[in-house]
Amino acid sequence: MSSQIKLTKNSYRAEKQKLNMLGMYLPTLKLKKALLQAEVQSAIRLAAESTVTNEQARDRMYAFAELFSIPLYTDAVEQCFSVDILEKDVENIAGVEVPLLKRVVLTSPEYSLLDTPIWLDSLLASVKEYVVSKIYAENAQERLLLLEEELRRVSIRVNLFEKKLIPTTSQTLKKIAIFLSDRSITDVGQMKMAKKKIQQHKE
């Protein structure tokens, strides 16, 4: 028996209180784990969809690849990669703060509609679509990583409660109870022996 375990009534009460608290807290942890599992699955789908959207936008942009190097339009194309407004917030999901992307506004290059070919509008639109979709895909991935990390942390705590803390505390409680019961029986036996000796002396 571990020397750290105090075989006293106070220790028994403390261990019983600890076991009750663990038992009360475990359902909350398991509920949070279930919520996080659902949110992670949702985040996985969103991240996958965002990635596909970004890849499709990239392919559409690459269709104009040969036109990117035309010096006359290089400045206009480069400006489309500049972000004017990136509006973000924080969203609380199952106790986890994750980034919420609210609005993305890119720089709108100025050019003469009369002096530029019609396809330039399509080229610049494809660049903007790619940049915006990439920002949203990166945000979705960041949300997923944060939720997965919290799920991992909570899962470890649930396992700790179920596999170690609760069983160990229960076992400690049992050891103390057995010791106190044995000592009580011994004490009763000694008292009976003492009374018997006293009675014998009186006789």
Swiss-Prot record:
InterPro entries, per database record: V_ATPase_D
UniProt-recorded Gene Ontology molecular function terms: ATP binding; proton-transporting ATP synthase activity, rotational mechanism; proton-transporting ATPase activity, rotational mechanism
One GO cellular component, as annotated: proton-transporting V-type ATPase complex
Domain of life: Bacteria
Keyword Calcium applies: no
Key words, A-Z: ATP synthesis, Hydrogen ion transport, Ion transport, Transport
GO biological process: proton motive force-driven plasma membrane ATP synthesis
Keyword DNA-binding: no
HAMAP family in alphabetical order: ATP_synth_D_arch
PANTHER family per record: V-TYPE ATP SYNTHASE SUBUNIT D
Family to which the UniProt record says this protein belongs: Belongs to the V-ATPase D subunit family.
Function: Produces ATP from ADP in the presence of a proton gradient across the membrane.
The protein's name: V-type ATP synthase subunit D
Organism: Chlamydia trachomatis serovar D (strain ATCC VR-885 / DSM 19411 / UW-3/Cx)
Gene giving rise to this polypeptide: atpD
